[in-house]
Swiss-Prot record:
Its cofactor is Mg(2+). It is found in: Cytoplasm. This is Nucleoside diphosphate kinase. It catalyses: a 2'-deoxyribonucleoside 5'-diphosphate + ATP = a 2'-deoxyribonucleoside 5'-triphosphate + ADP; a ribonucleoside 5'-diphosphate + ATP = a ribonucleoside 5'-triphosphate + ADP. Its main location: cytoplasm. One of its GO terms (molecular function) is nucleoside diphosphate kinase activity. Keywords: ATP-binding, Cytoplasm, Kinase, Magnesium, Metal-binding, Nucleotide metabolism, Nucleotide-binding, Phosphoprotein, Transferase. Belongs to the NDK family. It comes from Burkholderia mallei (strain ATCC 23344).
């Protein structure tokens, strides 16, 4: 097992439902530590830059519009196998296909308004964490 960091975003739909604390409890109960966190209302430019990997996909505009529709909670999670652990906690992208008890099964409404984002690999985790948090603002504990 490896100590890893991963980026997690609680998306506008879940923030609006006031379930940030419930989602944080799931992270902590799974052994993940929140080592950086901030609330933000993303600008269109930031959302487009963050999701640039999807720029040519048909859903890109809708994704960006959704991500700027309200505040998000952005956090860095740290722990053993944090990337996989967080992905397991999130569940399938489509909440209808997500296993019962996952964040998306419990809090998401649709494949678009799916409550959370999480890094999918070590390389993307490093880039995504750096996008939102300078190293000096991440505190291992």
């Amino acid at each position: 097992m490896a100590l890893e960091r991963t980026l997690s975003i609680i998306k506008p739909d879940a923030v609006a439902k006031n379930v940030i604390g419930q989602i944080y409890s799931r992270f902590e109960n799974a052994g993940l530590k929140i080592v950086a966190a901030r609330m933000a209302h993303l600008s269109r430019a930031d959302a487009e830059k963050f999701y640039a990997v999807h720029a040519e996909r048909p859903f890109f505009k809708d994704l960006v519009d959704f991500m700027i529709s309200g505040p998000v909670m952005i956090q860095v999670l740290e722990g053993e196998d944090a990337i996989l652990k967080n992905r397991d906690l999130m569940g399938a992208t489509d909440p209808k296909k997500a296993e019962k008890g996952t964040i998306r099964a419990d809090f998401a409404d649709s494949i678009d308004a799916n409550a959370v984002h999480g890094s999918d690999a070590p390389e993307t985790a490093r880039a995504e964490v750096a996008f939102f948090f300078p190293e000096m603002n991440v505190y291992s504990r």
